[in-house]
Structures are given as structure tokens and as C-alpha cells.
Amino acid sequence: MPLWNVGVNTKTMREKVIEQKLVKAVRSKGGIAPKFVSPGFDGVPDRLVLLPDGKCGFVEVKAPGRKPRPLQMARIKLLRRLGFSVFILDDESRIPHIISEIGGGENAV
């Protein structure tokens, strides 16, 4: 194992890269994607995506091929039942589609 890779969790790093690309893409559409943390209510999606014209959605970011934990899936299902758009993002190529679905328009990113 290379010395530079000692102690590095590549799953976490890959997830972080995807998350950073999502934030950048949302900004390019005039929106924001703050980290969503809810003390006392675990399992909520990672990012709240807020786009112009009052469009919003939630995004759970995972490393490629990873699935949400059972509690995360329960929260995703709850938010969807309440009528919110909720996406699971594990591939950066899906970012334009997600932004478009939330309300960023056909030509998203």
C-alpha cells in the first residue's frame, strides 16, 4: 500500500468528491446545496438542494455502488410520502438529471 494512502478511506473520499461536484453544479444553476443535519432525527439526506423559483429537493450522496442504510431509506420514503423529491446519488454522471428533476431546467449543467 502506498504511504500516501495509509489511513485513507477511499469510499468516504469518493463520496466526498461526488458531493462537492453536486454542490458546484447546483451553484452553477444559481442555487445552493447546504449540508442537511437534523439533530435528534438521524438518517436524513445529506444535502438540501434549493434552486431558483422555489424548487427544492433532497439528495443522499453515496460512494459508487453503495446503498443507503435502512434508517436512511425510511427517511427517504417518509420525505417522498410528504411529496418531496428525494434522490440517491452514487454516480456523478447523474448530477445533471437530478438538478433537472428538481427544477434546474432541461439544460442542467
Question: Predicted segment positions?
Answer:
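Catalytic phosphate/metal-binding cores of nucleic-acid and nucleotide-processing enzymes, i.e., regions
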Residues: 1-109
